[in-house]
């Protein structure tokens, strides 16, 4: 026997199994709370208790003097809970914290306002544990080691969790100001059902070094407000169904401006190899140990080889129905990693003088054949040693302007429109640069396609991020397309298991992703790439 009854807005399925009757509801979760003296006394979801500890706790606070010296602030304060307003106020020697608790349907919202009462010192960072959670079942996503944390630097700060009978999302409601939220560890490993909720700015020494610094200082005699929500759902709830409003808020604040309709494949060209110690061919041109660029005859041979490579590449591109090609190393590869790719077309004539009188003709061959051209640029500045035998890529104060200057040069001289942005990371934590940099560069060159090596969600609003098939990436993440439906990526197929991922790549191409392939010679893999586009 099987029947379905409609009760209000929920759907209750009554399933008969022998003499046992099971009720399964798809109605939204219902959150209820009870006030405590130092926070919450209870947090229930459909009458199931989820609160392990409801006391609000300040774990760390770091203040900075005008001279730059930092010191820890006091974490001991005097608490007062306003039962009517459901607001906790805690007074500290350096200021105050006010925490509001609000419930609506399946959501608990915490509003944390930090007041800096100091006349001179800035609050550099804070770390709060507003409460601790107790799940009915083991949290599936926690592996016992990696924190379940998210930040909103260039992305939404949303952590999706599942625990057997249900799911939950932790979200930072503000999509513009940086914040990190989530569950850093379990209290009861390996059971993994009890976790502190963490909200912080600046850095936490016990967290992985790869996490970004959350720069959100609170100036003297001012305040700041963090708004964090816990959203509860059924076991089959998706991140989009629980936090779609946060995604919508994100795209409203950071709308997509990318307009690139050509999704045909793009060819990759590498003219050189990394340093091999060849004194007569120090930049590794054509992986040829016998090439001697120090003589007039060697220069002539270099020119002939380069233009022949261009012609051969064009033949491959026609066969592949490519839209264009990116030359990664027009300056050669004289220096070791991580300076292998110079990424500065402005200095090609001086760093690779043998290229000076042939580079223009090289790129012209592609343009005259009807193909787009491209180069690699970096947001750092190359600094040569005094003897010019070594070099480093140095960060600059204004990477936006540096990228604009490099691209403008290559665009004016060679007509490039395909721009690979190499090593676009912060100096300290090696996370992707602020996406506003890519936004400004994209606005300066609306007819160019930017392809950044590293990316966050917001990068997709202005560019096509780079991925490699050999690392198991076959397409733009669905979570990204939930936010930016027209988002697409550039996926480098070389040395990747094309047969294994063929169906995934077919689906990716249908959705608009672009495949990058080797075009400076007829790579046997190219026919497999070509076949993907002929589905």
Task: Report each predicted region and the residues it spans.
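Bacterial Sec-dependent signal peptides at the C-terminal "C-region" and cleavage site
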Residues: 7-27
């Amino acid at each position: 026997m099987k029947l379905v009854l409609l009760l209000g807005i929920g759907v209750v399925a009554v399933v008969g199994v022998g003499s046992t009757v099971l009720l399964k509801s798809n109605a939204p979760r219902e959150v209820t709370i009870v006030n405590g003296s130092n926070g919450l006394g209870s947090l229930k979801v459909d009458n199931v208790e989820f609160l392990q500890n409801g006391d609000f706790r300040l774990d760390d606070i770091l203040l900075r003097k005008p001279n730059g010296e930092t010191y820890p602030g006091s974490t001991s304060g005097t608490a007062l809970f306003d039962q009517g307003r459901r607001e906790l106020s805690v007074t500290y020697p350096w200021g105050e914290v006010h925490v509001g608790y609000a419930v609506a349907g399946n959501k608990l919202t915490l509003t944390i306002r930090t007041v800096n009462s100091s006349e001179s010192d800035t609050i550099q960072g804070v770390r709060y544990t507003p409460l601790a959670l107790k799940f009915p079942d083991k949290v599936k996503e926690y592996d016992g080691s990696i924190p379940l944390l998210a930040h909103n630097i260039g992305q939404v700060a949303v952590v999706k969790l599942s625990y057997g009978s249900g799911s939950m999302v932790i979200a930072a409601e503000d999509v513009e100001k940086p914040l990190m939220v989530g569950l850093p560890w379990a209290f009861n490993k390996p059971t993994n059902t009890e976790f502190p909720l963490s909200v912080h700015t600046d850095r936490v020494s016990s967290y992985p070094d790869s996490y970004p610094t959350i720069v959100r200082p609170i100036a003297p005699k001012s305040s700041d407000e963090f708004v964090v929500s816990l959203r509860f759902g059924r076991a089959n709830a998706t991140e989009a169904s629980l936090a779609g409003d946060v995604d919508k808020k994100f795209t409203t604040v950071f709308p997509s401006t990318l307009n690139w309709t050509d999704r045909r494949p793009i060819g990759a060209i590498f003219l050189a190899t990394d340093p091999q110690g060849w004194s007569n061919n120090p930049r590794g041109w054509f992986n040829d140990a016998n090439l001697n660029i120090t003589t007039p005859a060697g220069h002539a041979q270099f020119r002939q080889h380069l233009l022949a490579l261009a012609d051969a590449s064009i033949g491959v591109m026609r066969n592949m129905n490519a839209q264009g090609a990116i030359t990664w190393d027009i300056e050669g590869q004289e220096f070791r990693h991580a300076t292998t790719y110079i990424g500065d077309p402005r200095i090609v004539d001086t760093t690779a003088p043998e290229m000076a009188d042939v580079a223009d003709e090289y790129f012209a061959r592609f343009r005259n054949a009807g193909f787009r051209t491209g180069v690699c640029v970096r947001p750092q500045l190359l600094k040569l040693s005094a003897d010019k035998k070594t070099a480093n890529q140095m960060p600059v104060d204004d990477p936006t302007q540096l990228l604009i200057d490099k691209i403008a040069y290559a665009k004016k001289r060679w007509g490039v429109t395909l721009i690979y942005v190499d090593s676009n990371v912060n100096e300290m934590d090696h996370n992707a640069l602020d996406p506003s940099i890519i936004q400004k560069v994209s606005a300066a060159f609306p007819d160019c396609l930017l392809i950044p090596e590293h990316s966050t969600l917001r990068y997709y609003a202005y560019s096509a991020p780079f991925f490699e098939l050999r690392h198991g990436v076959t397409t733009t993440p669905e979570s990204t397309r939930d936010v930016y439906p027209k988002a697409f990526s550039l996926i480098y197929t070389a040395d990747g298991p094309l047969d294994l991922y063929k169906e995934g790549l077919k689906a990716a191409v249908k959705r608009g992703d672009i495949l990058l392939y080797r075009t400076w010679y007829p790579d046997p893999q190219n026919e497999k790439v070509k076949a993907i586009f002929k589905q």
